Amino acid sequence: MEQWTTEIWFSISIAFLIGTLCGVLVMRFFKGNIQQQIQLKSELASAEAKIEEQKQQLERHFEQSANLLENLAEDYKKLYTHFAQNSEQLLPESNQVEFFKRLKNHANGDEDNQPRDYSDGSSGLLKS
């Protein structure tokens, strides 16, 4: 290989300095975009974290609601069983039969008469 002269070394160093200067200028020109990208990434990460937190809150809400409804169903079942057992113990059988007969007769009385779509007297503008 031939010996490189000082002129070649000088032109190589000038080209390196010009390239470095161009690189610095390009970086300064596009630096705003890089900062904007970094800001957008941080906003995206915070939005994703917020969505994940909301999902977890929603899951906890539904889990707690399911547990409360299950407890409510169990308590209602206990209440119904309590009333059923106490009504059998507290009401004599003859009273139970009479009580249910009265309820049945009362319900049957309503079924004998059909509902009417008119009133007994006149009403509205044509009252006499």
Curated annotation (Swiss-Prot):
Gene: zapG
Function summary: Involved in cell division, cell envelope biogenesis and cell shape maintenance.
Subunit structure: Homotetramer. In solution, is primarily monomeric but forms small amounts of stable tetramer and hexadecamer. The crystal structure of the cytosolic region shows a coiled-coil tetramer in the asymmetric unit that is very likely to be a physiologically relevant assembly of the protein.
Compartment(s): Cell inner membrane
Coiled coil (residue ranges): 37-75
InterPro entries given in the database record: ZapG-like
Compositionally biased spans, kind Basic and acidic residues: 107-119
GO terms of biological process kind: cell division; regulation of cell shape
4Fe-4S keyword on record: no
Protein name per the record: Z-ring associated protein G
Superkingdom classification of source: Bacteria
